[in-house]
Amino acid sequence: MTSALRETFTGLRDIKGGVLEDPETEYRPSTITLPLFFSKTDLDLEMIKRAVSQVGGEGTRKALSLLCAFVIAETVPSEAGTVAELLEALGFVLESLDTGAPPDATFADPNNKLAETIVKENVLEVVTGLLFTCALLTKYDVDKMATYCQNKLERLATSQGIGELVNFNANRGVLAKIGAVLRPGQKLTKAIYGIILINLSDPAIAARAKALCAMRLSGTGMTMVGLFNQAAKNLGALPADLLEDLCMKSVVESARRIVRLMRIVAEAPGVAAKYGVMMSRMLGEGYFKAYGINENARITCILMNINDRYDDGTSRGLTGIKVSDPFRKLAREIARLLVLKYDGDGSTGEGASELIRRAEMASRGPDMGEEEEEDEEDDDSSEPGDSDSFH
């Protein structure tokens, strides 16, 4: 079993220099064209309310494009320049798209209740919040989105001063209609992402954008990047050394991409630029394929256990991580040994194979520690590595 575990955790010692600069993986926003919708028709309050009411019905695409045009038209340019200049400064290519004729008044209006809350004083905030909420469907499926609306939307909307969003229609049929027109790579999706980036550029409203959508829009891969950076800081470890200690053979390809992405994000000036890089992958059709994130649950589990030793409560996030119970115990022990290894001074210490051998021995002993709090099922036995290495 020890040899199988060592084989699984191969590390990245064979990956040097130029191999990390994978030419087949492009993360830069310059590969993305962001549409800026505009309307030749004056967008009065009644037209905006009609568009809001039709989101989630057969007129969803037209309604959302008109709402994008309204937000762009109403956004006040910052000191950094116009809306277009801000997005171009982040490296995106822009194109202007006419929304065409106004929405048909005969379309169904599943979000009429939300539309009725709109007045002149709150129209921009409500419409922007609605776009942010709809954008979550680029990541969540209908069931997860319904759960999000039920459990989180009211609290987040109220905390960000857009309590009207509690009237958003979270019926699964309505969510399915919205999700059908918002997919990575589609023009409407890119237009909404452009609006998110504009909001992130303004310190006065950046917190709202982050709270309602941006942190979720960055994708699982960026969650792991954040955990990795936090763990490296906590340990005082060189990122390359820590990555070698964590990396399993099955995730080497994904790790290459994550290493490169971390480098680019670290060099990006300002929060909007950092999210611009992150989102540039979400805006392409190949985003979910680009990271082998399903294989990275084990690494995430170890990182959370490391960070929990410095920030109590981090490990509560492990509830949603699907790994087997034996690996949960192993992850805690690996985290403990990594803390001892680095001890805040970045020492290289023993190699990954020896560290994992010691962790495995300790995790099987009687002094492993408290019982697991989670009641989750073990991994699917068909997932690579689990049944052979950890059972």
From Swiss-Prot:
GO molecular function, one term: RNA binding
Location of region: Disordered: 346-391
Record localization: Virion; Host cytoplasm
Pfam families documented for this protein: Rhabdo_ncap_2 (PF03216)
Assigned keywords, A-Z: Capsid protein, Helical capsid protein, Host cytoplasm, Phosphoprotein, Ribonucleoprotein, RNA-binding, Viral nucleoprotein, Virion
Acidic residues bias (residue ranges): 368-391
InterPro entries recorded: Rhabdo_ncap_2 (IPR004902)
Main subcellular location: virion
Organism domain of life: Viruses
GO cellular component, one term: helical viral capsid
Function: Encapsidates the genome, protecting it from nucleases. If expressed without protein P it binds non-specifically RNA and therefore can bind it's own mRNA. Interaction with protein P abolishes any non-specific RNA binding, and prevents phosphorylation. The soluble N-P complex encapsidates specifically the genomic RNA, with protein N protecting the genome like a pearl necklace. The encapsidated genomic RNA is termed the nucleocapsid (NC) and serves as template for viral transcription and replication. Protein N binds protein P in the NC through a different interaction, and can be phosphorylated.
Subunit: Homomultimerizes to form the nucleocapsid. Binds to viral genomic RNA.
Family per similarity comment: Belongs to the novirhabdovirus nucleocapsid protein family.
Listed name of the protein: Nucleoprotein
Organism annotation: Infectious hematopoietic necrosis virus (strain WRAC) (IHNV)
Gene name of this polypeptide: N
